[in-house]
Amino acid sequence: MKNVPTIHPGVVLRKQFLTPMGISRSALARAADMSPVHVNNIVLGRRDVTVDTDARLAAALGTDQCFWLELQAEFDLESEKGVRDNF
């Protein structure tokens, strides 16, 4: 089985949305009614996406609701699998 790197939703947010769309983290924070620190921590992979965060990002970026939660769930499952595989 091939090892695929686990990607945090913050990486997707930065590489597929913010950078190509020319949106700053602070502009996203304003549009999503979130603190700039919260957005920055998601982008840096320091904070996970919650139901509330998913709804705010979906509204601000025009993504489907649950898009960000699904990315988070996939990240969590792959991260957990990696931990278990090390035993």
What residue ranges belong to the model's regions?
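Short, charged recognition helix plus adjacent turn
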Residues: 67-87
